[in-house]
Amino acid sequence: LELPLDHFRLIGVSPSATSEEILRAFQLRLDKTPNDGFTFEVLTQRAELLRLTADLLTNAENRKEYEDLVLNGASGLEFASNREVAGLMLLWESGSPKEAFKLTRKALQPPQTPALGSSREADLTLLAALSSRDAAIKEQDQRCYSNAADFLQEGIQILQRMGKMSELRKNLEDDLSALLPYRILDLLSRDLIDVCLLYTSDAADDVLCGG
C-alpha cells in the first residue's frame, strides 16, 4: 500500500530538522499514543515504523539518498500489508484525516474486508471513526458544513455496520446534531447564490434580446 506521506511528516518534523530534533520528536511520538483503544499489535507496528523513519533520517547518507529521491519526484511511502493499518494511523496523525478516512473505509470493504472479530477489524473501525471526526472538524473549520456532515454520517454508518464502539458512535451523532444549524445556513446560502446567478443570467439575456 502506498500512502501520500513522507518520512518527515510521518515523524512530525520539518525537512530542515536536525538529528537531535528528529530523535526528540521520535521519543515524544513513542510516549504519546494517539488513542487508548488501539490494539497492542498495531501500536507496536506504529512504533516500528517511527523507529525506521528516525533511523533513516538520522543517518546522514541514508537521509541524503532519500532527499534526492524526493527532489527527483518520488512521492508517497510504501507499506507492507502487515503494517498497512499502522501506516494509515500515521497518515491520520500527520494531519491528513480526510485521506486517512477514505483509505481506511476502503480497507474495510470487499475484497479487503478484515476477518470478523480480528484485531485488524477493531483497529480499522476505530481509525475510521476517529479520522471521520477529525475530517469533519477540518471541513467545519473551512465552513464546509455539508462535507463535515458527510464525513460524520459515514463514520457513524461504519460503526453501526460493525456493531462496535457505541459510546464513540454517540459522540459522532452528537457532533452531527450540533452541525444541523450550520448545515441549514449553508444550504440556504447556496440556494440564495443560485437564485442570484439565475437572476443575473436572466437580466443579461434581457439586455442581449432587447428586453
Describe the predicted segments one by one.
Residues 1-38, 49, 53-56, 63-72, ...:
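N-terminal J-domain/J-like co-chaperone modules of DnaJ/Hsp40 proteins
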Residues 199-211:
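Single conserved hydrophobic/aromatic residue that forms the stacking wall/gate
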Residues 33, 111-112, 159, 166:
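Alpha-helical junction/boundary sensor with strong preference for TPR arrays
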Residues 86-87, 128, 135, 176, ...:
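Structural register within alpha-helical repeat arrays
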Residues 97, 145, 192-193:
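TPR-repeat structural position
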